């Protein structure tokens, strides 16, 4: 388990207040960004979340192909480009897929889709550009773990990496792909999910870094017109354990388009109000990035 008292010993009120002011002075406590102004906040766009905050677990839910991984990659790249060290838990795809998805965002040819990269049907200029993009990816302070693992083992890895060199963001893609631990052998699946969420929440608090946890809904399995975290298996425990709950809903009218619109809903926000009306952003499928409608605020260079 994650012993809270081992990770976070008692502190005085003076020390807690000093930490609070330290976070306030550090961009209002934000230690990571989504890479999208509508979610990070800017002088032009009313922030929905204000970024990813230290010590908080954010659940990012949506259907398969709805942009969850692209959102996670956008946040990871934005954080890494700003100098923050990122741990990306790739439970669904191999490290090579993660690398190509990140590289696609740096390519200048159009469309730089992962499928085209895999096909190897590229011109000489495109290969040269891909090599340039690959060098940009290689320079990012980004760690990728694509090994099958349990929640406890992943958290132990994160703690070890953080003690070696502090992390700024931890990403899990995605929750339901964690393996069962021995302690879960006789537990119901919903109990296992609840314990895994608690482990990640404790990790965020102990390391005082934001943890972005992706949650997959069943395709077409939403029980309501607009899906919520309760449409995921074990959704009640997930909703309860998260500090923030963000839902991505693709706009059906742009389904299949190279750049489609996605509505972002904030169903739960620690210390703030939810955003039930939704905020539209763009899902650039080819580049595997999210950006604002005007395309101006993403920190990723295309």
Briefly describe each language-model feature range.
Residues 174:
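Walker B catalytic acidic pair
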Residues 91-93, 213-216:
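Conserved H-loop
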Residues 3-112, 132, 275:
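The Walker A/P-loop phosphate-binding site
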């Amino acid at each position: 388990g994650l012993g809270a008292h081992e990770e976070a010993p008692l502190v005085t009120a003076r020390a807690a207040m000093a930490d609070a002011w330290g976070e306030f002075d550090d961009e209002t406590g934000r230690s990571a960004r989504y890479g999208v102004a509508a979610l990070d906040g800017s002088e032009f766009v009313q922030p929905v979340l204000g970024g990813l905050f230290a010590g908080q677990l954010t659940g990012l839910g949506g259907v398969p192909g709805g942009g969850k991984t692209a959102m996670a990659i956008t946040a990871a790249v934005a954080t890494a480009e700003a100098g923050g060290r990122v741990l990306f838990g790739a439970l669904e795809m191999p490290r090579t897929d993660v690398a190509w998805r990140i590289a696609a965002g740096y390519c200048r040819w159009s469309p730089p889709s992962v499928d085209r990269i895999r096909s190897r049907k590229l011109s000489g200029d495109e290969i040269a550009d891909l090599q340039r993009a690959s060098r940009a990816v290689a320079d990012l302070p980004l760690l990728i773990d694509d090994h099958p693992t349990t929640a406890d083992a992943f958290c132990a890895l994160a703690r070890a990496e953080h003690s070696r060199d502090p992390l700024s963001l931890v990403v899990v893609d995605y929750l339901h792909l964690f393996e069962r631990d021995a302690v879960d052998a006789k537990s119901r699946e919903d109990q296992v999910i609840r314990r895994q969420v608690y482990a990640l929440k404790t990790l965020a608090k102990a390391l005082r870094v934001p943890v972005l946890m992706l949650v997959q809904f069943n395709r077409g399995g939403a029980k309501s017109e607009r899906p919520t975290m309760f449409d995921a298996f074990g959704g009640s425990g997930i909703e309860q354990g998260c500090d923030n709950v963000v839902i991505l809903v693709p706009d059906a009218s742009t389904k299949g388009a190279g750049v489609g619109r996605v509505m972002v809903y904030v169903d739960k926000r620690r210390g703030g109000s939810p955003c039930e009306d939704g905020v539209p952003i763009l899902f650039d499928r080819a580049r595997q990035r999210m950006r604002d409608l005007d395309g101006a605020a993403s920190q990723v260079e295309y």
